[in-house]
């Protein structure tokens, strides 16, 4: 056994490794459960009593020497790895491309933040809806064009199920579960069976706001509209209200702002009128309140809805709505600093 110990002792002096894998192999060979030291320890039991002290001391010294050698090799390898991985600060640096929010997300959040200032909170609903929440409860006549397949995407196997055409369905779901006062904001995606063009798409994003309480008037609605336009665009923005018709509001109106692309001079985006519609609005029809078990003789309310793509186009002067859904990185990178 003494000869074996002396052989290993001499071998340790000449040990060297090139990488961490070789070092681990070396450690297992000498210090592993089935390694050289373990083998010698196992044989130590059979050593004669008068030799145990001498051999035991040599065996312990060998074990210490092996551990010391492995620690030295590990430290040497660590220094080598560090020198190989040093960063050259003189090399040209290239910036990392950081992802940004989509312009639609930027504007939708901006819209929501404006209405948060007025005390509104967010409510959401499903994009796949039924006829009641999209049409019937909102006072749509059975022969209304919106119920036709030319305008709405119906589910093939059930004509009562469809992709919602507006977020007004969330208004109905909220009123069915909540009694006034109600002050709710409904952002989400909607779908319509329209040809895709620079001014229209088969899906887009909409935000609707509605308020129901005692003695709510059109004057309250108008004040909210003016506040929104100034906060969203500019404090000096020119606005106007035009009479309109929606089945779920009476009276109804549409709000226009002066075209931000041509400054009112007329262009293809505003159809050469100098004005662009940004939202529809009106006082909630009493029939809608009654459909949701809200007493229309006690309560009144207003509702307004806007297309986020339209607002985004005006705010950032984008002339083609299709750009928002094409995921062209060259287009999206322009909004890295947008707020």
Curated annotation (Swiss-Prot):
CDD domains for this protein: PheRS_alpha_core (cd00496)
Gene Ontology terms: cellular component: cytoplasm
Top EC class, one word: ligase
Pfam families for the chain: Phe_tRNA-synt_N (PF02912), tRNA-synt_2d (PF01409)
GO BP field: phenylalanyl-tRNA aminoacylation
EC id: 6.1.1.20
Protein name: Phenylalanine--tRNA ligase alpha subunit
Organism field: Azobacteroides pseudotrichonymphae genomovar. CFP2
Gene symbol of the encoding locus: pheS
